[in-house]
Structures are given as structure tokens and as C-alpha cells.
Design a protein with these regions (language model features):
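Hydrophobic beta-strand scaffold residues
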Residues: 42, 87-88, 116, 137, ...
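Active-site nucleotide/adenylate-binding loops and adjacent lid/helix of ATP-dependent enzymes
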Residues: 1-14, 55-57, 98-183, 194
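Phosphate-binding site of ATP-dependent enzymes
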Residues: 158-241, 269-270
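ATP-binding N-terminal substructure of ATP-dependent carboxylate-amine bond-forming enzymes
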Residues: 1-94, 98-100, 104, 111, ...
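C-terminal active-site "lid" helix and adjoining low-complexity regulatory extension at the edge
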Residues: 268-312
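Conserved metal-phosphate-binding beta-hairpin within the catalytic cores
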Residues: 179, 247-280, 290
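Short, flexible, mixed-charge acidic loops at enzyme active sites
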Residues: 78-82, 212-219, 276
Length: 312
């Protein structure tokens, strides 16, 4: 977008229909507040299935998509925005859909030269009955984010996680099962500039309760972030380059965040996933990395909006 924020009507999408609704509401509020502080006209939209009608009536100049998870992050809302021909932020239909499918995105990234973990895709009921791979391993829904529905099966466990087979399970019939990689939890934010993707820095994340789950990500004090991460120089550099490679290989636009595990005993860096709609909450990793390189929260939100386009 070439016009200044003060001349723009920005619709901020938040909330939505997924299990990550509360995180999205917090992200959306932060972004909307930042835009209003820069004189933009802002419409805050708790996005539902009537979104197309709401946007048609509002006629915004641009949509800032702060939705997370199913429907808002998987290509569905992006398709609505493409159909309405409204400039919007973050990745387009294909990259969004691909990144939300962990199994398919791993195949694309592996082909591009990104080091990904082993394991595979399994029926959740089979995973609930037996160990499909030797412990320790991680079970995660194939199409969820924010560590929703993620379980760690520790070494020596006699039985797998039975919750995965329960009728109340709402995260899809197929789950990813991957070997647990000991060591450090790392992430890298990437900004897709005109000259190519630029990785910001590497954050080392230490959960206060031992496992980086939903609570550790979003609860105050749930994790400790160290940036830049204290890593061997070659590992730090590799994380930056692998994150940029993932951004490009997946066709991401705007901002993305890549997550890694680093086994510091075996000196092995393994890519976990790319997030096309990273959180923008007070404890989120991307705003933190942006601040480290001199970009304030307000600057980051402005850049994201200025990067909007249609088609993506």
C-alpha cells in the first residue's frame, strides 16, 4: 500500500472460529490499537462465516489478518479476500493452506533442502492404542497451531496418550507423530522484503514448566526468551538461512516465523514448522525480535499493512 496510514481504512480480522480464538483476539487488539495510534481508521471485526458480507458493506482499503488456526490461517479467509479483491496481509491462499498441513509442508521443505524430523502421519485412534514409533515422541494435530493438542510421550511410557483417541478430540482424524528432539527450542522471524526474505534473529525459548505447550507460549511467565540465542556461530547462521529458505520454498508473504529444535549434544538443527500468521500478543516472538533489530511494535504493524496486496 503506497498511501499513508492516516488515509487508510483498515479492517482488522480477529477472533474467528478456531481453537486459537483467544490468542487471535489479543493479537488483533494489539494491532488495532497500534494502527489507531498512527491515525488510521480501524474497523475491528470478530470474523465469522458472514465475513464476506461484512467486508462488502464496510469497503475497507486493506485487511490486516490477525486470525490464527483453522479457517483464518489455512487459506479459507485468504480465498474470500482474493474473491473480494481486497488487499490483505500475510501469506496467500496456497502458502497458507500448505503451511497449515504439517505433513505436506514437511515434504515441500525437505525437497527444498530444509532438515525436518522423521515420523509420519497416523490415524489418531491407532496412536491412542499403541506406540507407533519408539518413545520419546511428540503427537501433534496435522492442522493446528499454537501447540494446541500437542502431547509429549516420554521415554519409558507404558501407554500412549489416550486423549488422542477420545470422542471429544476435535483436531482432526490424522495426527503427526515425530521423534522428540532434545535440546533447545528456537525460533526465527522472517520479513519478506522486496529484495528477498530477511531473517531477524534467533530466539532461544525455555519453558518454565519443561514443555513448550499452549500455556508456555501465551501465559505470562510461561517461558523465558533469550535473544539473540547463545549458540555456536554456525548453528545461529544456519537457523537464519533455513528460516529464509522455508519462507521462500513455501511461498510465504509478509511476516513468517520458523520454529526449530537444536540438539546441542549431537549438534543437529531440525526444522519443526513455519507459521504464516505469527502471534502479535504482548508475549509473542515476532514483535520481540522486531524490537531487537530496532523496529517498534507500531513500526512492525505499519510495515505489515504497507506490505498488503491482492493477489498475494
Amino acid at each position: 500500500m503506497s498511501r499513508p496510514l492516516s488515509e487508510l481504512h483498515v479492517a482488522v480480522l480477529m477472533g474467528g472460529l478456531s481453537s486459537e480464538r483467544e490468542v487471535s483476539l489479543t493479537s488483533g487488539k494489539g494491532c488495532a490499537d497500534a494502527l489507531e495510534g498512527q491515525a488510521a481508521k480501524v474497523s475491528r471485526i470478530d470474523a465469522g462465516r458472514d465475513l464476506a458480507a461484512v467486508l462488502t458493506a464496510l469497503k475497507p482499503d486493506v485487511v490486516l489478518n490477525c486470525l490464527h488456526g483453522e479457517w483464518g490461517e489455512d487459506g479459507c479467509v485468504q480465498g474470500v479476500l482474493e474473491t473480494l479483491q481486497i488487499p490483505y496481509t500475510h501469506s496467500g491462499v496456497l502458502a497458507s493452506a500448505l503451511a497449515m498441513d504439517k505433513h505436506k509442508s514437511k515434504a515441500v521443505l525437505k525437497a527444498a533442502g530444509v532438515v525436518v524430523p522423521g515420523g509420519g502421519l497416523f490415524d489418531r485412534r491407532e496412536v491412542a492404542r499403541r506406540h507407533v514409533i519408539p518413545p520419546p515422541y511428540v503427537i501433534k494435530p496435522n492442522a493446528e497451531g499454537s501447540s494446541v493438542g500437542v502431547y509429549l510421550v516420554r521415554d519409558g511410557a507404558n501407554t500412549p496418550i489416550t486423549e488422542v483417541g477420545d470422542p471429544s478430540w476435535t483436531y482432526g482424524e490424522l495426527v503427526m507423530v515425530e521423534p522428540f528432539i532434545p535440546g533447545k527450542e528456537l525460533c526465527v522471524a522472517v520479513i519478506g522484503e522486496a529484495t528477498g526474505p530477511r531473517a531477524l534473529t534467533v530466539t532461544d525459548i525455555t519453558p518454565t514448566k519443561g514443555f513448550y505447550d499452549y500455556e508456555a507460549k501465551y501465559a505470562p511467565g510461561g517461558s523465558v526468551h533469550e535473544l539473540p540465542a547463545k549458540l555456536p556461530a554456525h548453528v545461529f547462521e544456519k537457523a537464519l538461512r533455513q528460516a529464509e529458505l522455508a519462507h521462500t520454498a513455501m511461498g510465504c508473504r509478509g511476516v513468517s516465523r520458523s520454529d526449530f529444535r537444536y540438539d546441542d549434544v549431537n549438534d543437529e538443527l531440525v526444522f519443526l514448522e513455519v507459521n504464516t500468521q505469527p502471534g502479535m500478543t504482548p508475549t509473542s516472538l515476532v514483535p520481540e525480535q522486531a524490537a531487537y533489530v530496532g523496529m517498534s511494535y507500531q513500526d512492525l504493524v505499519r510495515w505489515i499493512v504497507e506490505d498488503a496486496s491482492c493477489p498475494r
